[in-house]
Amino acid sequence: MWDSSYMQQVSEGLMTGKVPIDQVFGANPLEKLYKRRKPKGTVGLQCSPCLMSKATSTDDIIWDQLIVKKTLADLLIPINRQISDIQSTLSEVTTRVHEIERQLHEITPVLKMGRTLEAISKGMSEMLAKYDHLVISTGRTTAPAAAFDAYLNEHGVPPPQPAIFKDLGVAQQACSKGTMVKNATTDAADKMSKVLELSEETFSKPNLSAKDLALLLFTHLPGNNTPFHILAQVLSKIAYKSGKSGAFLDAFHQILSEGENAQAALTRLSRTFDAFLGVVPPVIRVKNFQTVPRPCQKSLRAVPPNPTIDKGWVCVYSSEQGETRALKI
């Protein structure tokens, strides 16, 4: 039987901690419970061997991937370098291609010129071949003119083959008296006589037409339809009518060589050249003075009693209303 007072003392001792539990029970009844519990934060979680093997294989895969990435990066570096070299080479090739295209555009006129020269060479070859045939077909080369004249006197027409002295024979036949000459032969003789009259003097100072002479003077004048253009036309026409167009052009060039401009040369010639002294300026019919070239309208003056070109009066404009104005330089 348990003593109640003893049990009360034991209870109080246990409650107050004065009596150890081992002393009462001989062993701690919660010892097994303490052993089964795991202290917090002192020992890590323990994985099973299966999980540990799986973790190890994952680490290997990640490591392999890192190795593969590094290998690919090492391979891509030279590839990028080669691509950059290829791009630079392509840019250089493109530049050279554009340069070649530009040179081809420059060579194109040369090629066309080459074709033209080839055609000229071919034409010259044909002309040389015809010339060789020309000498052979005229009979004896020592007297081709006599042979031509004999054939012409006998038949009345030139021989069908080409002849070296054809022009000379035609001229002699046309100039001979008492001979019936056909129209074609007469025309050829007239043309030949004009050519035979060409001498050193006429060649150096040709009698130019008024239009050609005015165009030559225009090349030295600035602007268009100025009073000096009208003066050049008037002087050219007067010089052509007097047969001194060549001398007038020589005098014009002589003044230019002295350092004067074209306007000063025309003004000086209009006052000193003998063909223009005392010549009355021509009269030009116009509808009204508004049709006169605009650069000349400011130079229109009232017509004096006796206008002459050597006094600076170029021409006289006459309108349909009967009014007159003179162009003064």
Curated annotation (Swiss-Prot):
Gene this protein is translated from: VP35
Pfam families the record matches: Filo_VP35
Keyword Mitochondrion set for record: no
UniProt xrefs under InterPro entries: Filo_VP35, VP35_IID, VP35_IID_b-sht, VP35_IID_hlx
Keyword Aminoacyl-tRNA synthetase: no
Consequence when changing P49L: In strain: Isolate Sanchez
Location of the VP35 IID domain: 204-329
Organism: Lake Victoria marburgvirus (strain Ozolin-75)
GO cellular component: host cell cytoplasm; virion component
UniProt record similarity statement: Belongs to the filoviridae polymerase cofactor VP35 family.
Domain of life: Viruses
UniProt subcellular location: Virion; Host cytoplasm
Parts forming coiled coils: 70-120
Function recorded in the entry: Plays an essential role in viral RNA synthesis and also a role in suppressing innate immune signaling.
Subunit and partners: Homooligomer. Homomultimerization via the coiled coil domain is a prerequisite for binding to L. Found in a trimeric complex in which VP35 bridges L and the nucleoprotein. Interacts with NP. Disrupts innate immune signaling in infected host cell.
Transmembrane segments: none
Major subcellular location class: virion
Taxonomic lineage: Viruses, Riboviria, Orthornavirae, Negarnaviricota, Haploviricotina
Keywords: Coiled coil, Host cytoplasm, Transcription, Viral RNA replication, Virion
Protein name (database record): Polymerase cofactor VP35
